[in-house]
Regions:
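Binding-site signature for planar aromatic cofactors or substrates
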Residues: 1-207
Length: 207
């Protein structure tokens, strides 16, 4: 079974550049890994995606121009529908509809899921089916009941291939709640010491 991500990404021109730069042999081994299943999610990929609150999605217009969009929502807004399929609700944004328009012409997407604190990146190729508001059975699996945003449609993505990327040149970034988890013990300790100091000052004899 081929390495699905490499089969899509490593075109003849890409392989030519790999040859010129001396990396072709290592990627040839990657392509020849037996029983590759990198188009079906394991617990590792499913858990990683479920832990994200954003990702990047690339589409291509009918004129051939690529377009990258940031997609965000509550943690877990990208739903794992099965081992080959993910989906998410399309919340109303700036109403340019560039990605939606592109997908009506070409259903292929490239996705980047990022974990900045752990310098981890999951790349994915897929094909999108746009889900209308009349498909409530599907949309109900994509809704976030505790997130106040208007849903205009759903995206269901059939995974064609994925690959974990190296951590080089990914710089750590942290959400406020992630920083709070680290600084909370320090803040509590500072408050404790300040209170102890205040008591000591109050109990000390006046000069």
């Amino acid at each position: 079974m081929p390495h699905h991500f490499a089969e899509i990404a490593f075109t003849s021109m890409v392989k030519k550049v790999q040859e010129e730069m001396g990396s072709r042999s290592s990627y040839a081994r990657m392509e020849s890994v037996p029983d590759s299943v990198n188009h079906r999610l394991t617990e590792a990929e499913a858990g990683f995606i479920a832990g994200r609150n954003s990702f990047y999605m690339a589409t291509v217009s009918e004129t051939g121009w690529p377009y990258i969009q940031h997609r965000g929502g509550p943690t877990g807004f990208v739903r794992i529908l099965d081992e080959n399929t993910i989906g998410f609700a399309d919340f109303r944004g700036n109403r340019q509809y560039v990605s939606v328009g592109n997908l009506m012409n070409d259903d292929r997407v490239s996705l980047f899921f990022m974990d900045y604190p752990n310098k981890t990146r999951l790349k994915m190729f897929g094909r999108v089916r746009i889900v209308g508001l009349d498909e409530q059975a599907v949309l109900s699996r994509l809704e976030m009941s505790d997130y106040r945003a208007r849903i205009e449609r759903g995206f269901v993505i059939l995974i064609e291939g994925f690959d974990w990327n190296c951590p080089q040149h990914i710089f750590e970034r942290y959400m406020p709640e992630e920083l709070s988890a680290v600084t909370a013990p320090l803040t509590a300790r500072i408050a404790e010491l300040e209170a102890a100091l205040a008591r000591a000052i109050e109990s000390s004899p006046a000069k």
